[in-house]
Amino acid sequence: MLNKEFNKENPYIEFKEVYREEDYFDIIELGVYYYSNNGLNKRPYKITRVDILNKDKVTSPRLSVLEGYIKSWNESIKNEKYPNDWQLFYLYKEIFQKLIHNKDVKQCYNYFRGQSDSRYELIPSAFRSNVKKDFLRDFEGIYEELARLFPNRLTYHELSKQKIKDRETQLSLLQHFGLKTTLLDITSNPFVAMLFMLSENIDNYKEPTLYFFQLDKYADKSKIFVEVVKNEWNERIIAQRGAFLNFDWAILPSENIEQDMDAKIPTIKLVLKFDEKELQETLQASIQSLLDIGLSEDDAIEFVSPLENEYAKDNLKSMDLIKKELMEKLHEYFYSEVDLFPDFEKRIQYISSQYNLDLNKQLNIESK
């Protein structure tokens, strides 16, 4: 992890400026590719393959193990092993079995995070690009003032080695009630992570993403990892099987950290992607068939070009149907968005959102 001294006056501002995901996470990116599947009595999408997206950048010994898994997954896809109506869900289940419940592997992946778009970095909400510097500058004052106004709910603890464990408990409450903090939400349940991955409405093309983390809560190198301490105010976090990665640990002066902060968290980023390669092969095959019947190359290309736009529209429809299909299957396994909100205020908000006429205004339950 990054070993740097931060300005004591405004450490959050400086941390945001230098933060890089790769300084904290050793990420192997996997793509699950799908393709729009037109025709009567067909599922509207087809899973084509699983592949490694950043193979040329990976130095981790985990790579060879993953390559073996990918080979078996692709064989299952090729042989149409998965049930016709639920192809993607069962592929996810098989991926979970290999990465999470595999007795042949010493250390499996035990924490997860779902994000609706692969372009989003693994970064706590306080440090995201849509947050003003003023918030980071004023954060301590905001926290201190809230603790003064609501002493029965919140206690202020400064950012220091002596107070960090007490502070992170209070930060988890602030995040629970909607304030952006230095905590990154994760969960011990991959199906809950899937709910978050699918939480946003499909109004443009996005690549839903699941993260898998190897976190040993008893190892010094994972001290950035925080389990939630249950109390009367955090029912929602407990329902979500929640935990956090606390980046206050990365901001503390290095002499105060009795741990190996050079250790990065082994991570897999699983991205659902439209298969552009399959599209180009389909278009080329269409062009070739027109050439075979005597059309000129220019005429053949002109004739086929509109098909690319049609596939783009079909792709958006396919993604929307994939989301609905996965959510329906999660409901069959008794995982539902409403269960993520056991506390009174959030449950009321969620129920109200289901009756909004404007779907774009529905409650966004993405991880903070």
Predicted features by range, described:
Residues 1-368:
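Catalytic-core elements of nucleic-acid end-processing and repair enzymes
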